Amino acid sequence: MNKLMKQAQKIQEKMKLIQEEISKLEAIGESGAGLVKIKLNGSRYCNYVKIDNSLLKDKEMLEDLIVAAFNDAIRRISEIQQEKIASVSSSIQIPEGFKMPF
């Protein structure tokens, strides 16, 4: 039982480190061949939006491209997070059925 408690504590410590590292990650989503760029951090907060001046006259297209860039950024940050979790969790024994907190 003591061994299981120590292992659980190690898992908890590693997960805390993973969460801290993930919050520092960044990803840029793009659409319109790079005409719209959105940068998100690991907590999925938007850091910036870049819009090419050529898009300012077409509101509907601009709106669609912003949505597409945001969705691309979400996809990219999710992939980076999953890779990070997989790389760390492969080094520890996680009990079957254990769900990650994020």
Curated annotation (Swiss-Prot):
Coiled-coil region list: none
Superkingdom: Bacteria
Keywords: Cytoplasm, DNA-binding
Quaternary assembly: Homodimer.
PANTHER family cross-referenced by the UniProt entry: NUCLEOID-ASSOCIATED PROTEIN YBAB
Function summary: Binds to DNA and alters its conformation. May be involved in regulation of gene expression, nucleoid organization and DNA protection.
Designated name of the protein: Nucleoid-associated protein WIGBR5260
Organism for this UniProt entry: Wigglesworthia glossinidia brevipalpis
